[in-house]
């Protein structure tokens, strides 16, 4: 059973000021977490940091599980060596994605921390390797395509879906969730759907697993996406699902 500790527990110092301890950074993170209503942290996850644990680690932040009241949340915490001065822009993009029906629910954000829904599940490739039922795979693919189209139509580019292994989680109910809006932008050209189609159906490590459940013609898919690039329209989802026989 995972251990739950108060924010001030000494074991969390290595997490709240990772990778290099700075008392100023630690106190700033601690203050932001308190302002978000976080009182406890769950020592759970696959990554060890001293005597604590994380569920994720990136170039600018680390992620652990916290508690706001009786709700478990994912806490994204700015690293002490981060090149980004604040996580607030990422939180703003996540909030926008939420308005499109995409991403883990945002609960709050400060300069050094984001509190959001904790998505329990596996990344898309690992989930496929677990040999789910074909119908579940088909539903997940439709879900992913639909979410990417929604982001395109509403003007937010995720920025990292051409290499989406770490950015698409399939939860315990088989529903897809796109995560990590650190590189997202509302000003550049939207490429979510074209990026994820390239990742799913043209990247060999993913497509060989999908091919056990779905059939497609690469030339036809390429032509469909060329048409979409020339004239972005929601109609593309019907065309894609028809070709992939996902209806």
Identify the function of each model-found stretch.
Residues 65-69, 117-118, 170-172:
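Active-site beta-strand termini and strand-to-loop segments that position acidic
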Residues 95, 102-142:
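Conserved structural core of kinase catalytic domains
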Residues 27, 35-88:
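ATP-binding glycine-rich loop module of kinase domains
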Residues 171-247:
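C-lobe/activation-segment region of protein kinase-like
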Residues 1-52, 239-245:
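Juxta-kinase regulatory segment immediately upstream of eukaryotic protein kinase catalytic domains
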């Amino acid at each position: 059973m995972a251990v739950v500790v108060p924010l001030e527990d000494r074991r969390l110092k290595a997490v709240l000021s990772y990778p290099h301890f700075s008392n100023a950074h630690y106190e700033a993170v601690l203050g932001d977490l308190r302002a978000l209503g976080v009182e406890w942290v769950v020592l759970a996850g696959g990554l060890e940091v001293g005597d604590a644990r994380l569920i994720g680690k990136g170039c600018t932040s680390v992620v652990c599980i916290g508690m706001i009241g009786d709700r478990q949340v994912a806490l994204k915490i700015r690293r002490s060596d981060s090149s980004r001065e604040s996580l607030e822009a990422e939180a703003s993009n996540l909030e926008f994605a939420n308005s499109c029906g995409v991403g883990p629910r945002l609960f709050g954000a400060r300069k050094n921390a984001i509190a959001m829904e904790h998505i329990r599940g596996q990344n898309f490739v690992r989930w496929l390797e677990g040999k789910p039922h074909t119908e579940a795979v088909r539903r997940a693919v439709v879900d992913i395509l639909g979410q990417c189209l929604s982001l395109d139509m509403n003007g937010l580019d995720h920025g990292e879906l051409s290499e989406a292994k770490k950015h698409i989680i399939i939860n315990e109910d088989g529903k897809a969730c796109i995560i990590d809006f650190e590189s997202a932008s509302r000003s550049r050209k939207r490429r979510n759907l074209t990026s994820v189609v390239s990742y799913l159906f043209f990247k060999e490590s993913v497509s060989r697993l999908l091919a056990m459940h779905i059939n497609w013609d690469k030339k036809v898919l390429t032509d469909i996406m060329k048409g979409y690039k020339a004239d972005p329209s929601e109609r593309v989802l019907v065309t894609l699902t028809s070709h992939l026989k996902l209806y």
